Amino acid sequence: HPSDLIVSVHPLAIAPALRALRSLGKLQVPLVTVVTDLVTGHALWYHRKAALTLVPTRAAFQRAVDCRLDPKRVKVVGLPVADRFCQPVGDKNALRAQLEWPAEQPVILLVGGGEGMGPLEENAHAIDEARLPAILVVIAGRNKDLKARLEAHNWSRPTLIYGFVHEMPDFMRAADIIVTKAGPGTISEALNAGLPMVLYSRLPGQEEGNVTYVTANGAGIWAPQPDLIVTALRDWIEHPEHRQKAAAAARQLARPDAAQQIAHILAAKLGVE
């Protein structure tokens, strides 16, 4: 392919692309890696023949250096997410009115990814049974059976059930707390919304560092059991100053300009203004 620049966003594509360039005698074509694991990315992300490696955090930068990359060819830019997740938060009450959500109590947003996987139902019931003075919004994703069960349940507290939604940026900006698994994309989107996180599950290895990154910086809490989720939520609801401190920490970590910064770097590589 007559490329002037190759960009890899997956660790398994980097070495094959470089081998292909070598076999074609086109090693002058630069390969830029955009690392999409926040902290504990696999070593395959960090190839010394890459012209430039763009990483989301300082911890990922250190990981690259530990993998013997030249620090001058590694740059911290944040994790790129869709532009819809990078807009200013704005007026929460106006957003809630638009979404037809009650405005008088804190909103807990419970998500389990687009497929509605994991212990979402168990966590929803535990939160409801705790009778917290809050509104619970549950996103069941594409899991239609789960959505039907949740809709049929007799909830003790105000609870809103959704399937797969396209308004997730507005949902995040309108909520006060998100309860989610520790995926890098959702974490980055929540940071951009200044949304404190209760993280309840993680993939071994690659997502373990995500939990440490969020909790060590004060933007969230690790709560892998339903009772721990309830404890974290109760503290943030009964002590709004604790929640506000976590929200401020999330805003401090946010990198809403990541995609634009990456685009500018790639354009500069191509000599394009």
Regions found by a protein language model. Give the residues of each.
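Active-site and donor-binding regions of nucleotide-sugar-utilizing enzymes
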Residues: 1-68, 73-76, 82
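A nucleotide-sugar donor-handling region in carbohydrate enzymes
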Residues: 51-107, 112-114, 141-142
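Nucleotide-sugar donor-binding patch of glycosyltransferase catalytic domains
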Residues: 199-227
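A short, well-ordered alpha-helix in the C-terminal region of glycosyltransferases
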Residues: 242-256
